[in-house]
Amino acid sequence: MTRGYIDDSVNHALDSRLIGSSVFQSSDALLDQLLSLHYRAHYHINISTKTKFSALSALLSEVEKLPVLKDELHCAIADNIYGIVFCELDEKEKGLQYVSKKLGSVNGYDRFGRMLDLERLFYKGNVDLAEFSSESWTIPKYSDGLTWHYLQAIIKGLDLSHFKPKTPFQWMLLTLNGSATDSNLLSYSHSLLKKSRFPNADESNNFELEQFHMVLQEHLKINNLNVKKEWEQFIIDSMEKSFQSISVAKSAMLFYRKVDLKRSILNFTNLVNYSNKYYELNKRYPDLLDLVSSYQFILSTCKTPFEPFFMPANVSSDFLKLLERIHNKYSIPIIEKQKALEGSSDVLDLCLASSTASVLSSSWETLYETSASSLPALVDHSQIFYLSNSLQTSLNASVSLKFKFAYHLATLRQIDQCIAYLKKQILTLHPEHFASWHLLALCESCINEDLQVSFKIINSVIQSMCELFDEGRQFTIDEKWQFIHIKLTQLQLVRDMFALEDALEILPEVFELYQRLFSDASEPLGPQINQSNDYLLQKIWLFALELYLENDDIENVKAALDEFKNVTSKYVNLNHNLAQGFVLYTHGHSEKATAEFEKVLHYDSTSVEALIGLAKIVLPDEEANLDTDLKHNSKINQKELHRNSATSLETSSAVARLKFLFEELVDKSIEGYQTSAVWWYLSKIYEIYSDSTRQQEALWRCIKYEELQPVREFKFCNF
């Protein structure tokens, strides 16, 4: 075994521990054992808090049974384990005996030694700013997650009000502390540029300049809404004084996000190219976690393609490979796709370094968001795979991430699993997470035909929200949106459980609630048209119109259509055309109804409602008669269409077009794929074409989604 292999395996083990891994397979078995004990100490401190004291006491016994340590690195790790365990067991004096020791050379493993040093400083407490006066301190790699963990923890306790930084590392302290300003950072950046020059062929880029760009990146992240224009010139000047700098390219990517998205993407492309060239030369990436974070940033920022250099689907594919590479390289457990659904509620409690966990979890979540509207990614379980790993790599999963997971289970029609997850993982810990209560009620409506459970949940949530509102609770934008849709779900339940008249009686309460919640028109739900307050109000009118239409209340139907249209003139809502189409169809005006549905399909060929509306006209229910309007509709050529003539239907261009549109819908649209009526009409079309195999498949899917149909679509609880 060569010395090079030994060093490489030890280096890899130390790198693995720095990123937060728990698996070590170096040529030094005792080192692996010490690193494992170090991981377990962190795990018991941060994860298994309920059994922390007993677990740490047991771990201490294991450390004491180790053989006599002579190697400097071994001794340093053991001292840190003793120190942090004694401190966590409230035996501070014993702990200080270990963490107060001066760290030796640790056999030249400087990056790992830096982490041990910071760990000792943190547990020693009362850190003196003078500790960081030496110019030997440098900004750690982002892959050195434990180093960042302790550095950020120490910074929180430092008084930097009178600190005068002289090195990039010291400027990083000031930046992370929130005390750095654009003016003083720019002043230092100018002095750096003066002593920087483009490197010769045998030279590297200016190290200090490269380090300062890491400072700038943190500054841009913290102040992303207020980026100073002056930084652009510094970035351009830095490019002129460096060769294929990954750090400068990342600064440019971050800077141009708000200024010029295309340039941001171009710099991301440069960053990736430089990283790949580095890999070709060195057989490793300079900082794999940093590269992963850059992918996460750009995919969460840009959802649209910029041909030919940026295609989100291709970038996502490369991103997934990088994520899997980092998991494999550092033996970080990954939930395989085929097992993601089987153990959907059972994820491991990992104790990664906090910065590592943040990058990995947000990366998996970004992959989910990027594919959220992809039907293939839903069907092949890619989405649940992404969400499962986002949850597993998160140190403390947010309620929003947990809700995404629960919502996705509901989307997959894993109703029992979703209910169990909501109750155990969300509502027990977050009893005021109204979206989860709403989702729970919708799930219960799938499996309880009498709807009593759903009705009790909805009424209880509405009562709770009303009380909180009356007490002065300031609801968030998404909570206001949720409140309205919970109220609409209540109306739907009343209509289904009791009578249409009862639902109509409490309909005015929805409009009153809207006025109370959205009295301040200057507070929009979001930047998109479908996130505007007006759009939500139109949704309410659309719901009201459906009730009036069912009640055959022509006067109120017309009034609701007018109110819907008069809400705003800023944009045309295709939902108005849909509503108009169904009103016309209900009253026998098939030709005019067809025109409305066609108008919607012109703008959105995957509109489920428009296609169903058109299908109602082209393929009327067997008990219905074809009306005169339909027979003379030149748009869909129905002159030769007769009720009992399968042959004429088969040759009808209208039926052929419907077949094409429905098949395209179930190939592309998640909503279309999961709508029972879509499969019902497809089965009728396949019957016309004598395709019994596909007819049976369509009927099977129709039954599946009809049986697990919630009282309102799940999308109405997902803001």
Swiss-Prot record:
Q: Which InterPro entries match?
A: Endocytosis_PI4K-reg_protein, TPR-like_helical_dom_sf
Q: Name one GO biological process term.
A: endocytosis
Q: What is this protein called?
A: Cargo-transport protein YPP1
Cross-referenced PANTHER family, in alphabetical order? TETRATRICOPEPTIDE REPEAT DOMAIN 7, ISOFORM A (PTHR23083:SF464), TETRATRICOPEPTIDE REPEAT PROTEIN, TPR (PTHR23083)
Provide a GO CC annotation, any one.
plasma membrane
Membrane topology annotation: Peripheral membrane protein
Q: Which UniProt keywords apply?
A: Cell membrane, Endocytosis, Membrane
Which residue spans traverse the membrane?
none
Q: Which domain of life is it from?
A: Eukaryota
- Say which family it is in: Belongs to the YPP1 family.
- Where does the record place it? Cytoplasmic granule; Cell membrane
Protein purpose: Involved in endocytosis.
